[in-house]
Amino acid sequence: MRVYQFTEQAYYPTWNDHSGSLRVILPNRKCDPHVAADLFHRYYDEYQLCDELGIDVMLNEHHQTATCMSSSVVIGLAVLSRITKKARLLVLGYPIGHRPDPLRVAEELSTIDVISRGRLDMGFIKGIPYEIPASNRNPTELMDRFWEAHDFIIKAMTTHDGTFNWEGEFFHYRQVNVWPRVWQEPHPPIWSTTGSSTQARVLGERGYVMATLGTGFGTRKLYDAYRKGYMGKFGRAPGADRFAYLGLVAVAHDKEEARKRGDLIAGYLRTSAIVHVPFRNPPGYISAEDNARMLRGETPPRGFTKDGRAINIHATGVDDLIDAGILFCGTPDEVYDQIIAFCEHCGGMGNLLMMGQAGFLTHEQTVDNLTLFSREVLPRLKAWKQPDAEAVAKAVAA
């Protein structure tokens, strides 16, 4: 199992002064650039520590929000591709459907892959609804635009015999010829995220690494949809390396201290949805079917524990988050057991996206959290034998 450390790089000093929305409309006068600089340096120091500890790195981007200062993920990738030496660098993700110029995306990511000497994992995502005001995109066209941008980027990265032209619905180019060419052949590994069984099946058909974020014990349903898509396309079961899950992680030698850390990290969940209602679900962003499920209360923010009990992940405590597989929290032995139980429930999982820092967790607490995890949990996760993929797939197909 690989483990990637992730933080939203939040500007948390303003979390208690938001006037009802931390996203889109929060005035940037509430951001002190000197404080922001200190926070950025702190977050990069923690990523450098991960490189030393054998933990890989995950970055993302969001816009116009105090929940995430990383508004351009390639800036973080550029910094980390130079100051780290061993860690894989995962971008999860890059909202390519929002971008005006996928050629620039192909050039940026190709350059990052070269500077890092082949350590880039590139995750392409649709993006959350709060991003639409910043990009001014039509939400009804977003997925079509996403897949055209995806197809163009892959073609640009894999064409090595001169220029080509592109005439699509959204993008038009002449004489495309990306320099430098990517380090990894034919291109860096592709990841994506979803909370939809339909989209999970599509990702399975493409063979991409699929990540789910905060889906708890509902993750197995999404993994099985992926397995069906993958088996239908490739005629074999997908390996555990095709599956990833983002979970909050708080570990300490003392159980009480671990719970304190877990509660601080869970501040990410409590603040991420503080946004004015009009920005939460713009018309056309999701399908009519998914909107109907939301109205019936069948989709997040509700999560589900292993026994099927529903919880609101944005307004609950540490115990419920542990029971739902959203938070792995406790002593090293407890955290290891929780992660393995979750992996077994899902039929295998090769990539843990570990939110080992969030919210008000201090630098000192974060360093201890990451260091203890790397010494007493990570080696056992790497040594753990995944469930037999073919046996899991046969059970899904039965």
Model-derived features: where do they sit?
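Active-site mouth loops of central-metabolism enzymes
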Residues: 25-41, 93-103, 184-194, 249-252, ...
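Hydrophobic faces of well-ordered beta-strands that scaffold small-molecule active sites
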Residues: 3-7, 57-59, 89-92, 120-124, ...
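Glycine-rich, proline-tolerant flexible connector loops at the mouths of alpha/beta enzymes
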Residues: 58-76, 96, 130-133, 214-216, ...
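N-terminal beta1-alpha1-beta2 module of alpha/beta enzyme domains
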Residues: 1-87, 188, 391-398
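A conserved active-site cap/scaffold subdomain adjacent to cofactor or substrate pockets
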Residues: 195-223, 227
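An alpha-helical appendage that flanks or caps ligand/catalytic pockets
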Residues: 4-31, 52, 143-179, 219-346, ...
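Conserved, mostly hydrophobic/aromatic
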Residues: 3, 61, 80, 112, ...
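Acidic (Asp/Glu)-rich catalytic clusters
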Residues: 48-52, 77-86, 109-120, 204-205, ...
